[in-house]
Regions:
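N-terminal hydrophobic/helix-forming segments and targeting peptides
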Residues: 1-261
């Protein structure tokens, strides 16, 4: 259980989750494949392939491949969240606020995002001479989406607008998002980013006998972790395959989603 909780706590985004799953597979002697090369697979060996640093397929081939079938399990690496837009901030000069410019991602329970310590993590692309670099980042800064005081919401209704009521506070109006971003990628030119909010509260066991897990991102990291763990520990009698796709929360129709090739 501790290993699972540790996995959840350091899997801030789909990109971090795939990196952590890859480390598990590497420790179990799975061999990495790439899609731009032909594969020479051997009976009794284990392999994995990653696409777009956010999806992974791992499989085991039994020693005997005569009349074998497939055992397949699938899950997804992404979780409901808020995604940072390309124009990263909204400056409210009148109230001296800098808000992170976000949009909803996936099927979230909106009220669970209020009044919690929120982090920003994901990947950032920079231009370096003649190449593009990908950086996996996790901001030290903590944000918050504040709720409204009760005397300002007498109606009792709760129907927040994500683009108005749920932009997280990032600092005062002089806060520079670009300057903070450069803390994590250096002075190289930032050309793009895939950044998401996540709940900084760590997973923990709760209940009289610690029989329950309290955590964000259980949808669907619980299945991602347990399916990869099961594959690693299995004694393959068939071709056993585990697929962890991205973008399930938004329809799976991406080049690294379940509706891809």
């Amino acid at each position: 259980m501790k290993q699972f909780i540790d996995f959840i706590n350091k899997s801030y985004t789909a990109f971090h989750a795939i990196k952590n799953l890859e480390e598990m597979l590497e420790k179990a002697n799975f061999k990495k494949l790439t899609e731009d090369c032909s594969w020479e697979l051997e009976p009794g060996c284990s392999y994995y392939v990653i696409r777009n640093t956010s999806s992974i397929i791992a499989f085991k081939i039994p020693k005997s491949t005569t009349n074998v079938g497939f055992n397949i399990v699938a899950s997804h690496s992404d979780s409901p969240s808020f995604k940072v837009k390309p124009n990263g901030v909204v400056i409210d000069t009148a109230n001296d606020f800098c808000k992170l410019n976000t949009e909803g991602y996936g099927g979230m329970i909106t009220y669970s995002w209020f009044d919690r310590p929120l982090g920003v993590a994901g990947r950032v692309y920079t231009q370096s001479e003649n190449s593009v670099k990908e950086h996996l980042v996790n901001f030290d800064e903590t944000l918050v989406i504040p709720s409204v005081a009760i005397h300002l919401n007498r109606s009792g209704e709760f129907n927040p607008n994500m683009q108005i009521d749920m932009l997280p506070l990032f600092g005062n109006s002089s806060t520079s998002f670009d300057s903070i971003l450069k803390k994590y990628v250096g002075n190289e030119e930032v050309i793009s980013h895939d950044l998401f909010l996540y709940n900084k509260e760590e997973a923990r066991l709760v209940g009289a006998s610690n029989e329950y897990i309290l955590s964000s991102r259980l949808d669907d990291l619980e299945c991602s972790y347990t399916s990869i763990k099961a594959l690693i520990e299995s004694d393959a009698k068939a071709i056993s395959l585990c697929a962890v796709f991205n973008n399930e929360e938004v329809g799976s129709r991406s080049n690294n989603g379940a509706d891809s090739t």
